[in-house]
């Protein structure tokens, strides 16, 4: 059976997706820590649709209906 291969999300290097790589989907601990650091410094963000903030602005109590 052929081992699945993916690209490291940080550097793009080809990586085997199996138990022999403890850092998957990353190629190394270095790439894994770089990615973690980018989340910690808020370089990555999940887009806000603005729907929740609109509800809070319209309802001063902040409670949901």
Curated annotation (Swiss-Prot):
The gene is yacG. This is DNA gyrase inhibitor YacG. It comes from Nitrosospira multiformis (strain ATCC 25196 / NCIMB 11849 / C 71). Zn(2+) binds at residues 8, 11, 27, 31. Belongs to the DNA gyrase inhibitor YacG family. Its cofactor is Zn(2+). Inhibits all the catalytic activities of DNA gyrase by preventing its interaction with DNA. Acts by binding directly to the C-terminal domain of GyrB, which probably disrupts DNA binding by the gyrase. Residues 43-65 are annotated as: Disordered. Interacts with GyrB.
């Amino acid at each position: 059976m052929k081992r699945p291969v993916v690209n490291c999300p940080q550097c793009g290097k080809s990586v085997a997706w199996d138990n022999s790589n403890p850092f998957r989907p990353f190629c190394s601990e270095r790439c894994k820590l770089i990615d973690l650091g980018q989340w910690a410094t808020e370089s990555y963000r999940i887009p806000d649709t603005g729907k929740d903030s609109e509800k809070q602005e319209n309802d001063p109590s902040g409670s949901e209906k």
